[in-house]
């Protein structure tokens, strides 16, 4: 078993008996904030129903964190808590929660700057000396917010200085401008560079999808994130997975549930559907080794590579209409998979593919025979072939 899979297995094992008890291990799905601690008893069961495994909660005090973790444990949800005492009284805070059945990891900092490295390294090392079982969580900036041309330098600084067991970054590519969907041009470069960094260090990475519609204002460049459709979510989640992400995070839980009334939003079922698809495809993606990723289309995203030849000896021909596709060749448990994603989250695309020899499709309903060389990919969706 490679180092990455060992780390993933160790993290998943933390959830046994509470937050992740299933017959088959699946890609963990995390809701990032957006859940008031005083409503945790009501909201955590809804999170479980929606298909979430873990929640990252930012709390005003250790007492509030523990209360929320108690509610999470009852619902079968794991928690990555952040609260002031973790930094101010590290030894006492770790002692108070390290044996809690809901604990997954310790939240240290979201989107730190480069000058935060020294104190974060010290905090990380102190916590790991007190509790070597549960890892620490730090989430890094997207490239557009952190000097795109120096982004690799910045993420390498963190990877070299702070020995976290996994890496995390956020970028939300689906925006709306004048009523139309616009994909951030920086997104796939971010996936390329972050996944390459994680691979260099032999560790898994976690990535995001946007579940909460809102306006992003100053000091960031203005943007509007629309109410997510299934196509929007599929494009984000499946792109993350095709590049090798091992945990999918949603910002925020408030995208699925009105946390004031504790009522489900219309988007609840959309997110629930997306989560069911993540779990169904987990045998392909959990612990996978991404061999290569290419793009097709008249224009391909910045800093990606065009598919110039067939991705595998079994593929005779491959073409995708419309905006183009993301094509990922993966290996997992001795099996080889080819995943093809419609890079358009609004419109369908037509896939025309031909193979040499026996090939099967891996679907949400199981492995099936390939019935036709031509198939329609719904917005943002994927098809997976077992080669």
Where are the regions that the model predicts?
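Sec-dependent N-terminal signal peptides
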Residues: 5-14
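Glycan-processing catalytic domains of CAZymes
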Residues: 21-358, 363-387
